[in-house]
Amino acid sequence: MIWIALVLWSTLLTSVVSQPEERLGNAVCEAISNAISPASDVFYFGGKLFFADIHHWAISSTQYPACTVEPGTAEDVGIILGILSSTQTPFAVKGGGHASNPGFSSTTGVHIAMTRFSEVAYDSTSETAIIGSGLVWDDVYASLAPHGVNVVGGRVTGVGVAGFILGGGMRFSWLTNQYGLTIDTVVAYELVKPTGEVANVTENSDPDLFFALKGGLNNFGIVTRFTLRTFPQGQVWGGLITYTQNHLSEVNAATVKFSNDVTDPKAAIITTYNFLLGQPGVSQLLFYDGPTSPDGIFDDFLAIPHFTQDVKTRDFMSLVLASPSNATQNLRGVFNTVSLLGYSDTLIDAIFWGAKLSIDTGLFISYDVEPFRPNIFSVSDTHTESAYPPSRSAGLLPLNLYYAWSFDISDDVFHDAIRQSAAHLYNVAVGQGQSDIVGAAVYPNYAIFDTPVESMYGSNVARLKQIKASVDPDNVMALAGGFKI
């Protein structure tokens, strides 16, 4: 019922986004249109594809550009970058459009939509899949399912492939406990460098650039395709349970017990504490990579009286769709995060303090508690050094904070509130003895827009700057938004 209300409200808000401001002239857009091949197109304000190109999951991430460009080949991406560089035109690159930070994948300049990079090609001999950067994970899972294989990707519907991987591949997968971070399963990146050169970047061909692309976001060019390792995938068990606020203490206890006691790498959960118009509740996702779950792993959750329950044996795609995460699209929103080493009852109880900051005016607020095994940074047999995480000595667990609201007049209020909430939870964790999180890296894909790059990449920043200067001597990628090296 709460999700229906959100859908109706968010649909209403699609007409509230600001109208186009004074935009760039069409000269750059026309130059691009004249230079690219027939495989690519340029679109202007008013057209259906223009609006599809700029659409984001959070409307606060949408801006109105002078035009949108849908490149159809890597070579055309290079041509586009050349024109943008020579004219010093601000631009954005959008993959799936799930970024919440304003200006990270949107612009008032030239908006590059990677929509046409939509292939999924499975190679049974190498046990890899080539995946286009314009896809969302839903598309990938659906394409690989007939082959009985899967990749380590996003857990809920609507998440883009490109941002997920380039931001660290750690908005953890249901398969992370078994196979590691998504970035540790990347075999190759097809990258259009800022100079326009198209390169197939592997650990052997260019180890420094390969390192930088593993979590370094859009600082080194535009990735058009990823080659990922695949893994066998059969039926899974799990789904969504919702609980009302009178069972919060039981959910807290079950979550902490799971986090501390469960060692089966096939088992995973997300406990999401929701506040809809100030009313608390819990959305509980359960997952087991097999048709049935062993006794004892999820018993505590199943024993709690529920409001709704959809837990069963199903295919992997069905489980991904079980989470109603798209119900909050078309709202204004922001993520933030705290890196933790574990969860306790008192730490989870502290979540409610943060919610009270905006409980009277926030349309939707959520905190995702995501327990994983402590060896997640080293479980992959192919893991190598990466831009993120800068250290793999401890398996950090990123608590994901998400605030959603209706109108831009409240942006600063909610940005400040989510910062305060994250700071409070961090202080509680440190006070409980999690001293190793002091100075620990923040996960880029959850980080709020003004997070310093040093907080994400730590001691790797100096090396990343050297790589950036080498691959992008004219600093072309500084014309695009995002966390800048």
Where are the predicted features?
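Soluble FAD-dependent oxygen oxidases
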Residues: 2-3, 9-485
